[in-house]
Amino acid sequence: MLKIVCRSLLLLPTFAFAADLPEMVIGEVSTKPGISLIFEGAIKDDVQPSQAFGLESESDIHIEVVATWNEAAPRGAVVGGFVPYLDITAVIKNQDSAEEIVVRLDPHLNMSDNFHYARNTKLPGAKDGVYTVTFSVRGPEAADVGIHYDWREEVGEKLFDGGIFKFTDLDFLDIAESRRR
């Protein structure tokens, strides 16, 4: 028992530190069929393989979408469970210079969000600029996931209709200047 208590005490500073890290909730949306989308700007991180997910040393932020089933989800879906097979991109636009980049968000796994869609990226302009981020979230193509008869009868021919979600006047400076470790 003493070993467990000692190990737990060693982890407390890690949890306290993680709780103090800034994270920016850009917006939240609930959409059919019972999917919650949380759009976030987070501190860049070491994600492997880094060539595929963005080098921490060459990035300003970690742009992400947490996609989970909510209480309105079809039967069989686990509330809070990850919604797989989404195709998500983010267009990050500097409102002053009109410079923009398109970033594809792919599945990631960490200890705080579990599975989520994200990418480390450089901002298209100064860290202290004002930005618009437009997220495009689409369900999988018909050939990418099988849809059983019961889903087709109760929900429809596809997982998710998708949508475009635009957020303006975003200030990423605190996130861009922060470090995880």
Model-found features: residue ranges?
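A short tyrosine-centered beta-strand micro-motif
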Residues: 126-136
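Short amphipathic, basic-aromatic surface patches that mediate peripheral association
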Residues: 61-80
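Solvent-exposed serine/threonine-rich low-complexity stretches and specific carbohydrate-binding patches
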Residues: 102-111
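Sec/Tat signal peptide C-region and signal peptidase I cleavage site
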Residues: 14-19
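Extended low-complexity, serine/threonine- and proline-enriched intrinsically disordered segments
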Residues: 80-100
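Compositionally biased low-complexity segments at domain edges in trafficked proteins
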Residues: 163-181
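Aromatic sugar-binding surface patches on proteins
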Residues: 111-120
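Short acidic/polar inter-strand loop motif in beta-rich domains
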Residues: 137-151
